[in-house]
């Protein structure tokens, strides 16, 4: 089964980046051509019938599959980055983390009014970053039509932070 092949290429690193965290490392997916292709296909499939104008990739591991996913949809790729990393005019949204707050930014010209957008990241944990990205897309006049994740940590209930009426897909759940 494709999902199991993908799962077999995600390794858990205990106590990284701090004690008690079980870090899900997706870099083995990038080393194996078959795992890479299966992951990209699994990310695309739930949205095959959708019209997609942009894929927003969340810093930083959303940049690994995000551009390829955008290319599959013949859509543009939009990097959503932490404050101070984008060179042009930006809008920003503050969001909460388990250990504090951060700020997510997008270029002001990245989303056009009416653009249909998928928000993509490698992992859905608490949902704070995806929620901030959603708010930025909406502020620029875009329409979020889907959420795309490789991994979902279901026990953290991150989906509760996302727009309820919008489909959210993750390949692997822990």
Tell me what each language-model feature is.
Residues 1-174:
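PRPP-associated nucleotide enzymes
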